[in-house]
Amino acid sequence: MAGRGIALVLAGLLLGGCVHTQLEPSSESNFTQRDKKLLANAPYAKANIPTAYQRAIVQYHRKEAPGSIVVDTDARYLYYVLPDNRAIRYGVIVGEEALSWYGIAKVGRKEEWPSWTPTADIKRRLDVPNFVEGGAHNPMGARGIYLYQANKDTLFRIHGTNQPEYIGQAISSGCIRMTNEDVIDLFNRVKMGSIVVVLAPRSGDSPSNPQVATAGDPRLN
């Protein structure tokens, strides 16, 4: 179903010359039975995501290989790179500037409905439990994509959320949050070992800017 949706959107791009075309929402055919049950009983209201942050296929102006992930923290977007200078763009929640992480990592682990064990730093700043089981109430949401460097967990993740109303804002403790529907979609696409590039704030290297982003990240060349 997801492949068919992408094919239709790409056809629309070619016929209409469009740069930006909205994708259809995630089909439940991509959800497990557990996904359907937990999302149907989620303890939060369904958010009205602004059009600018809804999933779309867009032109892509960097040189990362298809299958890579690039996060533009300034614009609050995550890109999953496709062939032919295209990418799937998702609206995300990013970390507050003092807490945000940037750099190059790899996907070192993937989990469905992950549990959450807050880091010592988070526990110093926030009144949170020591451990939260996976589920719709969990801040990690429906999926966790764990970022590793040199085979070591960075403690930063791309994951779902139980606060979808904050998509497009910078309020997290450093991790990249997505709607649960979008993180399920990304999780099903991204492979273990895939490159993840999180751009530094104000780097001027946005994937949507063809004037400054054509070279990609030099550390990947």
Per-region residue spans from a language model:
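N-terminal pre-domains immediately preceding structured catalytic cores
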Residues: 5, 10-221
